[in-house]
């Protein structure tokens, strides 16, 4: 049997949830990239690309929502440290015929990583796209939200395989 209390940093020796103490960790440059897809009808993608959505510029709204969400991650995820982010970028790329790819990059000089901020940015950007387009396509699917890479800190560099970075079907 695996002792998960030893493997999971947010669980103490009694099995209770806790916020990890990072005060002794050195300040280093931390960067994370996450991505996700919103799969939709081809007509919905055309509407977004043409800027014809009734609620306005879908991609601009989703970018801003993703950036705002990254900045609020510590408020949304209970055991996540509140961080002063030095940079957040969210890009949204239409991928013919039926999806958009969202990529978020988060950066800070700090004692803990920014993976949750990047993942939160992608998630909220995807939800914003869904919200703005649901009147014409309730069957949209938010899919494959994953950490693409992270660097900085004791655990070093992580990179998902390059083939997972492209706009592609499952």
UniProtKB/Swiss-Prot annotation:
Q: Keyword set for this entry?
A: Lyase, Molybdenum cofactor biosynthesis
Pfam families of this UniProt entry? MoaC
The consequence of inactivating this gene is:
Grows normally in liquid culture, traffics into host (human and mouse) acidified compartments early after phagocytosis, suggesting it no longer arrests phagosome maturation as well as wild-type, impaired growth in mouse macrophages.
Q: Name one GO cellular component term.
A: extracellular region
The UniProt record gives the binding positions of substrate as 79-81, 116-117
Q: Which reaction does it catalyse?
A: (8S)-3',8-cyclo-7,8-dihydroguanosine 5'-triphosphate = cyclic pyranopterin phosphate + diphosphate
Superkingdom: Bacteria
What are the protein's GO molecular function terms?
Answer: cyclic pyranopterin monophosphate synthase activity
Q: What induces it?
A: Expression is positively regulated by the transcriptional regulator MoaR1.
Give one GO biological process term. Answer: symbiont-mediated suppression of host innate immune response
Residue positions of the active site: 131
InterPro entries xrefs: MoaC (IPR023045), MoaC_bact/euk (IPR047594), MoaC_sf (IPR036522), MoCo_biosynth_MoaA/MoaC (IPR050105), Mopterin_CF_biosynth-C_dom (IPR002820)
- Known EC number: 4.6.1.17
Q: What class of enzyme is it?
A: lyase
Q: To which pathway does this protein belong?
A: Cofactor biosynthesis; molybdopterin biosynthesis
- Give the family this protein belongs to, as stated in its UniProt record: Belongs to the MoaC family.
- Assembly mode: Homohexamer; trimer of dimers.
This chain's function reads:
Catalyzes the conversion of (8S)-3',8-cyclo-7,8-dihydroguanosine 5'-triphosphate to cyclic pyranopterin monophosphate (cPMP). Probably plays a role in host phagosome maturation arrest.
Q: What is this protein called?
A: Cyclic pyranopterin monophosphate synthase 1
Species this chain originates from: Mycobacterium tuberculosis (strain ATCC 25618 / H37Rv)
The gene behind this protein is moaC1
């Amino acid at each position: 049997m695996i002792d998960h209390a030893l493997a999971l940093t947010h669980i103490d020796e009694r099995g209770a949830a806790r916020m990890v103490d990072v005060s002794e960790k050195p300040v280093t440059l931390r960067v994370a990239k996450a991505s996700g897809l919103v799969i939709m009808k081809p007509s919905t993608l055309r509407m977004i690309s043409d800027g014809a959505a009734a609620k306005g510029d879908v991609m601009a709204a989703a970018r801003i929502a993703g950036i705002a969400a990254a900045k609020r991650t510590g408020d949304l995820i209970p055991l996540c440290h509140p961080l002063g982010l030095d940079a957040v970028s969210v890009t949204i790329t239409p991928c013919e015929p039926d999806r958009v790819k969202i990529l978020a990059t988060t950066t800070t000089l700090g004692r803990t990583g920014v993976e949750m901020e990047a993942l939160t940015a992608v998630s909220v950007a995807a939800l914003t796209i869904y919200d703005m387009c649901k009147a014409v396509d309730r069957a949209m699917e938010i899919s494959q939200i994953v950490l693409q890479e992270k660097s900085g800190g004791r655990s070093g560099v992580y990179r998902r395989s390059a083939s997972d970075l492209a706009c592609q079907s499952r």
